[in-house]
């Protein structure tokens, strides 16, 4: 096979794989036959199975973004056994994952933006960042190092006794009457269930609320640099 035929065959094969994932070639390799695409609407029946209950907690917080972080730390400090489910592998969500370094709305726009308007757990986090020179007042509001923010968020959770589960994607809830009694979680080990008395939905999309069947209003943000 010369170079021209090799390249021709390689391109055709790659195109077929990208299209359907299934490729058949004849013996001469002059033609490539691609199987027809699957039609939309087809379904596959998933066999029923019993889901193992692997843990339980007073409170399960779904999502490890800024809201989930604050909710988990606050609840754990009040003595609750807290499990935080984070589908990624760091805390902070879009704040740290997308390098949103500005602490918007934490400081008042008056008096050169140096009048603090937000306190509490966020203030504690900022104090840790500032003490390690990971907060820069290059303008108003200040900028923070997002990698350091991930670290200190986790540190505060661990100190409070929050049990963080990374790579854990909440996918459904189990209801007992009008109350959630368990959360189904997709993990690297498969689907598992975790029992709980309370759930705080910090998914960013209101997923848990939707799964319960409660009424909600769907609001779609315009795609922009502000709403990612």
Model-identified regions with their sequence ranges:
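N-terminal Rossmann-like FAD-binding beta1-loop-alpha1 element of flavoenzymes
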Residues: 59-80
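Mobile, glycine-rich extracellular loop/lid and propeptide segments
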Residues: 66, 169, 196
């Amino acid at each position: 096979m010369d170079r021209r035929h090799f390249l021709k065959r390689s391109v055709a094969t790659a195109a077929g794989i990208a299209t359907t994932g299934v490729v058949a070639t004849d013996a001469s390799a002059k033609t490539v036959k691609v199987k027809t695409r699957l039609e939309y609407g087809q379904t596959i029946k998933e066999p029923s199975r019993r889901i193992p209950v692997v843990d339980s907690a007073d409170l399960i917080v779904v999502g490890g973004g800024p809201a989930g972080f604050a909710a988990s730390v606050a609840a754990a400090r009040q003595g609750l056994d807290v499990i935080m489910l984070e589908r990624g592998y760091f805390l902070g969500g879009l704040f740290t994952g997308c390098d949103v370094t500005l602490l918007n709305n934490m400081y008042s726009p008056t008096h050169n933006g140096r009048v603090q308007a937000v306190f509490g757990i966020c203030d504690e986090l900022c104090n840790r960042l500032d003490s390690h020179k990971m907060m820069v007042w290059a303008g108003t509001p200040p900028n923070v190092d997002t990698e350091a923010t991930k670290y200190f968020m986790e540190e505060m959770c661990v100190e409070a006794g929050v049990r963080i589960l990374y790579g854990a994607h909440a996918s459904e809830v189990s209801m007992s009457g009008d109350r959630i009694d368990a959360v189904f979680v997709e993990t690297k080990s498969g689907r598992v269930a975790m029992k709980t008395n309370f759930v705080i939905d910090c998914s960013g999309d209101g997923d848990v609320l939707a799964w319960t069947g409660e009424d909600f209003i769907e609001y779609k943000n315009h795609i922009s640099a502000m709403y990612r």
